[in-house]
Amino acid sequence: MISQVIEVPSPLGLRPSGLEDAPDTLRRAGLHERLGSPDAVRIDVPSYDDVRDPETGILNPQGIAAVARNVAGAVDATLDAGRFPVLLGGDYSIVLGPLLALRRRGRYGLAFLDGHADFQHPSDEPNGEVASLDLAVVTGRGPDLLTDLDGLRPLVRDADVALVGYRVLDDNDHFLGEHIRSTAITVVDLTEVRKTGTGRALEKALATVTKPDLEGFWVHLDVDVLDDALMPAVDYRHLGGLTWQEATEILSGLLASDRARGLEVTIFNPRLDPDGSIAQRLCDLITNTVLRRPAGDGPARSDGYWPAHHQAHDHRRLDEPLPLLRGHGDQGVGLPLF
């Protein structure tokens, strides 16, 4: 399947520290050419505002919501063209866009490869950064401005999420980890990966995101899931993490599924990679996994059903049954929050 690179140089969920340069850096490192997508789609990003929104306490929520809708449009067009979207951030907040695009189509899963839980509640986030909240936000926890995009809260159900590679180093990590484990989210933390191996970790994640009642899944790769000694080019460093080989094995297995609908890569800060060596390794990781995807004309489901052009997207809530033939209009009742 042909890939389509979508550049989303957004620092709105964190800060403009250099991660917004990642798409251009990866292009210069040859990623776009290697993926066969020299003509990337680029999403415009509003100016960064370092003053918190008074209603939500979050930095740049309106800008993040606007970027999410624009990204959703680009992902939607890419899928309708039968291509595989590869999003390059930017910070973690860009995950809202592809999940909104998929949510408009139906019910999808999320394979969330991340060294952090990203499950803070906005009231507990000291800096107002959505980057610490993104998994909470996409599962419907937080202000309506971000959690109820297009009236479709949640973008993904807890039971349809697999968090892989998360590691615990301090009391806050432990608290968030315990909170996540009290939900229906599947957690495959770093300790479990090391204990059972990447094969079992992959099997557990796929069991969650390829359930028969899901129409596919999205893959979020936060590069801080990698070992800090190998990936120091991130703003919030965190000791330990996956090796390049472990990350390749897990990501390859996820993307080899014909249920995978796209990949998003976030948080790489090229200003912390002065010789460009990390950018080259990251290009290798992305190309070596994306290019192993099954051949085909488009994102066909394993049951053979996939409408090539969606004239009507589903706008039902995720706690309602999703019929095979979908249409506009039903809003239903949202899932409970914390």
What are these regions (language model features)?
Residues S3-V86, P98, H179-H310, D314, ...:
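Catalytic cores of soluble, metal-dependent hydrolases
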Residues L169-R181:
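Short, glycine/polar-rich helix-capping loops at beta-to-alpha or helix-loop-helix junctions
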Residues H310-Q311, E320-H328:
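Ser/Thr/Pro/Gly-rich low-complexity, intrinsically disordered segments
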Residues I6, G90, L113-G115, V164, ...:
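Active-site flanking residues adjacent to catalytic metal/cofactor-binding acidic residues
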Residues Q331-P336:
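Short, intrinsically disordered C-terminal tails of secreted or membrane-associated proteins
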Residues D80-L149, D158:
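Active-site histidine-anchored catalytic micro-motif
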Residues F112-G115, T139, D160-V168, D189-T191, ...:
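Short, structured patches in soluble enzyme cores that scaffold and shape functional sites
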Residues L12, D91-V95, L169:
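Gly/Ser/Thr-rich loops at beta-strand to alpha-helix junctions
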